[in-house]
Structures are given as C-alpha cells and as structure tokens.
Amino acid sequence: MFSLILLAVTLLTLAWFYLKRHYEYWERRGFPFEKHSGIPFGCLDSVWRQEKSMGLAIYDVYVKSKERVLGIYLLFRPAVLIRDADLARRVLAQDFASFHDRGVYVDEERDPLSANIFSLRGQSWRSMRHMLSPCFTSGKLKSMFSTSEDIGDKMVAHLQKELPEEGFKEVDIKKVMQNYAIDIIASTIFGLDVNSFENPDNKFRKLVSLARANNRFNAMFGMMIFLVPSIAQFLFRIGFKNPVGLAMLQIVKETVEYREKHGIVRKDLLQLLIQLRNTGKIDENDEKSFSIQKTPDGHIKTISLEAITAQAFIFYIAGQETTGSTAAFTIYELAQYPELLKRLQDEVDETLAKNDGKITYDSLNKMEFLDLCVQETIRKYPGLPILNRECTQDYTVPDTNHVIPKGTPVVISLYGIHHDAEYFPDPETYDPERFSEESRNYNPTAFMPFGEGPRICIAQRMGRINSKLAIIKILQNFNVEVMSRSEIEFENSGIALIPKHGVRVRLSKRVPKLS
C-alpha cells in the first residue's frame, strides 16, 4: 500500500515539474510572456471556472500588458498574443503565407461536417473559398433582398401586435433580432419559412439553444476545437458526435431531396450549394445561377451533401449571431443618444420618401449615417472578439529577434484593439462620427471587424445588409427609448459577445414620415 502511495506521489511530482517546465517555454526562449498563467489552463482559467468568455479572458491579458507580442498559454499550449494593430494586419494580410490557417479542428476524411470554410486548411480552404465566392456577389445579394425584407415586415407585424396602441413597452431587442436573424438565415440559406416570431420552438431556434448550452462541457469542448484540435480530433475518431451538426445534416438532406424530387428552385444560398454539388461550380451569371443544372458524369469533381451542410452550418451559426447582435447593439446605443437616434430616424424617413415608401437594396447602401452607426457598433461589439491563426512557417517578428515557431497558435484580441484608446480615442463612447470623412478620429489600420486579408469574412456584406435592414424597419415603425444608461454584461461562455440579460429597450408605435 505504501509503495502505491509513494508511486502515485512520485508520478504527480514528476507531472508537476514537467508542466512547470512546460509553462517556462516562452521564458526560456527570451520571449516576452504573460506571468500570471495558472496550470493547467493558462490564461483561460476564468473560462474553465465559467467566469469569462474566451474572448474577454484574452482581453484581460491584453489590457495588462504593453508588449507588441506576448507569449501566453492556452490550456497547456504555448501561443502568441498580438497586441499591435500594424503587426496584426501584417499577420492577416501581408505575411499571410506564414499564417494561412486558423489552426482549429477540422478532419475532412473522418468528420466531413467539420470541413467548413472557417476551419479548412491550405489548398482545401483555397478551393472552397474560390467555389463559394460567387455566392456573395452584389447580384446574388440583391436577388435575396426581397426575402429579407419580407422577414423584416413579419418582425414589424409581430411587434405591432405586442405593443399597446399608446405608450411604451419594454422589449428585449436582442431576442427580437435573434428571431429576425434566424428567420433570415433559414430563408436565405435554406429556403425555409420557420417564422420564429409565431413559432419560437421551431427546429432552427432549437439548434441555437443546443449550440449555446452554457455548461462546463461546452466550455471545454469549445476551447479544444479552437485551441487543442488534436484532442477534438481524437474524440470524434473514437465516436463522439456533434448533435448540432447531425441535426443540420438532416435538415439539409430533407430540403435538397425535396427540391430535386419536385424540381423546386429558390433564390437562396442552398440553391447555389446544390448547383455546386451538381456541377462543381457556381455560375457567375445571376440568372443562370439559380437554375437546376447537371454535369455529365465524370467531368467535374462535385462536393458531398456533408460538405454542403458544413458550409450551411457555419453560415447559419455565425450569421444569425452577428446579424442579430449588430442590429440589437446599434438600436441600444442609439437609444442612449437621442440626438443620434433622431438623425438616423430622419435619414430613414428621407430615404423612404425618395423611394415611394420602400427600402431597396440600392437605397439602403446609400444611407451614409446608417453605415457610420453600424461601423461604430461592430467596432465596439465585434462579432468575434478574437481572431486566430496558426503560424505555418517559422516567423521572425519584424524589428525584433523573436521567432514564432511553426505550429504556434496566434491570437489577436480584436476586442482589445477596438477598445484601445491608442487607436480609438475615448473607446467606450459610442461615436459614429469617428468614422466620417470629416472627423476620421481613429486609426484605420486597427479597424478589422471582419478580419483582414485573404481569409476576411466571405459573408460580411450579407451580414451588414441584413443588420441594416432590421435597424431601418425598427426606426421606421417605432420610437425607441433606453431602459437605463449602463454597459451590457456578457455571458461567461463561448467566444462571441452574447448579452447575459438580453438588450432591453422601450418601444412605442410610430407613424413613418414619408414627406
């Protein structure tokens, strides 16, 4: 018995010294490093304790240092945090050849549902990006605009029923915008009318709830996918299944089979992905691209149903969160500054008056103050508070002797850079004018809400258009007041900035001014 205890103590002691030496990796290399990392979670200890989301845990490290680059530990994995905006842009764009992969979990062979455009590596990513780019041309987005507007009108109709004829009512505008975004994505990607306003328990909303379940397992698994992909790969190879991905696969399979059986064609992203499966490409011609096309057997390598699902899944999960949050945060911030709210509401009224009471794709894109407001929102509340890459070849940090070894995870605290007074004076103040040509009160190098370089978000224009449309619909039909002037508290799980208690405002009915 004593021998077993002694053996256990010896093994634990050896393990401790091994980990301690492991956590001296950056110090041994003479690299500036974060000195408060705890074993075994590194700077993510607060994520494991469910006190902070991953993005805000990284932000805490950002604000405690003044170094351009900093050695950190993500779980037990040495990584590099970049705090300098110029260097961040170099990593994402000019020096892309050294950082062309995100380094997150992907297993094309054994887990094709993981092979989405966000996760894919090397040539696989380049090929998928090339195939998907035609999905997001101006012509394609314009053809989907009427679908988005119909859903915006359903949102307005729902709120009109909920609000009293006179006076204000408290509303969680984030919940409203999430329903709007889910319906937009379900319709413009899958061609399905789920109507989350009237049917809140639909299968798409359930997918979001499942993906967001706030528990320790999800926190740990999310960290592994991003930070320790080898462990995530091992789990999937021994039989672990992603219930959200499998549910999405079933939806895609049923929808594709129904369309092909009945010859149904819709102007949505899934139709383009079906075309990609059948022909190996998406037609640049916007009229042809939505037709049913087949290719002769053996001429073109097509993609699988699982690959279609992987792309639809990432667009759905990422799109519904960023679209809904951007619209909700914009309305919340405007409500705190009545003069800004009135200015944008006037722009909405003027645009409607010039276009016979309608918002068109072209008129939306001409609304200058709306664009400034959305830019300031995604500056203060970036859709992803961190940007991640993997060093794909040894890289010497410019103007230093520090070398980032191949295979090292690289993290950019976008939330940190966007909230740094060095780049954005008075960063906690919501100031759309900082982006105007007259003021230009910010460092353009530091503004990277969708990333930068070849891996910049492929669907950024689609997201911005749908967010702007939602804002227009609300300001056209409702008056908005803030409940209280306070900063939003965020959930302590996941990566995105998800409000812990919703985003609450007061709405009342409004008669649009069309002249």
Swiss-Prot record:
Heme binds at residue 457. Its cofactor is heme. PROSITE patterns: CYTOCHROME_P450 (PS00086). GO terms for cellular component: endoplasmic reticulum membrane. Transmembrane segments: none annotated. InterPro entries: Cyt_P450, Cyt_P450_CS, Cyt_P450_E_grp-I, Cyt_P450_sf, Insect_CytP450_Detox. Keywords: Endoplasmic reticulum, Heme, Iron, Membrane, Metal-binding, Microsome, Monooxygenase, Oxidoreductase. This is Probable cytochrome P450 6d4. It comes from Drosophila melanogaster. The gene is Cyp6d4.
